[in-house]
Amino acid sequence: MKAVRIHQFGGPEVLTYEDVPDPKPRKDQVLIRVRACSLNHLDIWVRKGLPGVNLPHILGSDMAGEIVEVGEYVTDLKPGQRVLVAPMHFCNRCAKCVAGVQNQCRQFTVIGNAVDGGNCELFAAAAVNVIPIPKSLDFNEAASVPLVFVTAWHMLTGRAAIRPGQTVLVLGAN
């Protein structure tokens, strides 16, 4: 498959478009044909040398596409389904995860940062991170959702501690 990778840190000139091996999904993963991957500021930080990134590296934390293959243990997703990928990985077992603050998990990572991202043709994603997208969103719109949604969600449910029934003001909605 084709992918955009970096082999060194720097400006846009370090981006290379090249052939890389197709990913092989595990039994608990799905293989996604990436149709859109949006640019997040995290991609720029990683490209410029964010600590903890192994090279070569594929950027891209926000992606959407369609499932082409499902692993043996995956029962709720199907080939052909249009999906986006929640870019956060966490253990889902520690006290922080159980409390709903997965972004504080010691095993917390972000796709496109600690692991290769979605600036590629095919991406193997854990089924628990895959979310079907409604027909009302195209792939470009869906790819703009993942990381910004998670950031907003954690601020609203964590810092602001909003609860069902409370009234909130949403600025900038359309």
Task: Indicate residue ranges for each PLM-predicted region.
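Nucleotide donor/acceptor-binding cores
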Residues: 1, 81, 165-167
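Glycine-rich beta-strand-centered segment in the early N-terminal region that forms part
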Residues: 21-38, 50-98, 129, 134-137
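Conserved hydrophobic/aromatic positions in well-ordered beta-strands
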Residues: 4-7, 68, 123
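Cytochrome P450 core scaffold surrounding the K-helix E-X-X-R motif
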Residues: 42-47
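NAD(P)H dinucleotide-binding glycine-rich loop of Rossmann-like/cofactor-binding domains
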Residues: 89-173
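Terminal peptide-recognition signature
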Residues: 3, 34, 152
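Short gly/ser/thr-rich secondary-structure transition/capping motifs
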Residues: 12-17, 48-49, 113, 150-153
